[in-house]
Regions:
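Membrane-proximal helix-loop-helix units in multi-pass membrane proteins
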Residues: 97-158
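Short, highly charged, low-complexity non-transmembrane loops/tails of multi-pass membrane proteins
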Residues: 206-224
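Small-residue-rich transmembrane alpha-helices that serve as helix-helix interface/gating elements
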Residues: 159-160, 180-200
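Hydrophobic alpha-helical transmembrane segments in multi-pass integral membrane proteins
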Residues: 157-178
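The first (N-terminal) embedded transmembrane alpha-helix
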Residues: 10-30
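Membrane-water interface of transmembrane alpha-helices
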Residues: 54-69, 128-138, 200-207
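Short, hydrophobic transmembrane alpha-helix segments
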Residues: 26-40
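Juxtamembrane helix-capping/reentrant segments at transmembrane boundaries
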Residues: 68-90
């Protein structure tokens, strides 16, 4: 059946939109390469990395939803609790957040310590989450031929978010961190956790949702 409206947008159209944003932000970073600080380049590069991360989770090879929903014990991992609509909102909202943060940094002329801290934690949480999911799925599917802890999103989590996190850690060297910096970091992380993930997922999770995933991507090879 041909998808229309929001169902069409939530299929993969929104991913193409994110990729356009990534290309534009890449151009902006290159144009300001000799002007922007390392910290600002990384904050802006998160806008580029999220679409790449989504491409790995959804398309090449795809199937992140299967490991995510399976981890939370779902009997319907193709649709519950994560569906196409909720994950679209999660990733689009996170991208918009980092566009806003990049704009704030450009206006201020610097990246605040709070923003650095929040982004560092966010980056390393991606590492932890994908490692935990990877181990879980390895244990679950090793009898069916799975031999690694790889899961959709792992490559961009390890070689994208983790690398960015390490670079930003070096940027903290010699700087004094105040309680106000941790508060700012906490606000950013709360927006990501609550606003981008928990609210859309909890509001939209339905076992009879029309926004189900049509295949399990990478995991289909183990489910035959």
């Amino acid at each position: 059946m041909k998808k229309t409206g929001l169902n069409w947008w939530c299929n993969r159209t929104w991913i193409k939109f994110l990729c356009v944003i990534a290309v534009l932000m890449t151009g902006l970073i290159l144009m300001n390469w000799n002007i922007w600080s390392t910290e600002l380049k990384i904050i802006a590069a998160i806008v580029v990395l999220i679409p790449l991360h989504v491409l790995e989770e959804w398309v090449f090879p795809g199937g992140f939803h299967y490991q995510y929903n399976s981890f939370f014990g779902s009997a319907l991992p193709d649709r519950y609790p994560m569906c196409r609509l909720s994950d679209m909102i999660t990733n689009l909202a996170a991208t918009i957040l980092y566009i806003i943060l990049t704009a704030i940094c450009v206006i201020r002329g610097e990246v605040s310590l709070g923003m650095l801290l929040g982004t560092i934690v966010f980056c390393f949480l991606e590492l932890v989450v994908h490692t935990v999911f990877g181990i879980f799925m390895y244990v679950k599917l090793k009898a069916k031929g799975k031999t690694t802890i790889y899961g959709p999103g792992s490559i961009t989590a390890y070689w994208g978010f983790t690398v960015f996190g390490v670079i930003l850690l070096y940027c903290l060297e010699g700087r004094t961190i105040l309680s106000s910096d941790w508060i700012e970091a906490g606000i950013i992380l709360a927006i990501i956790a609550v606003g981008c993930i928990l609210l859309p997922e909890n509001f939209l999770k339905k076992k009879d949702t029309q926004y189900y995933f049509e295949n399990n991507g990478y995991y289909d090879r183990f489910l035959k």
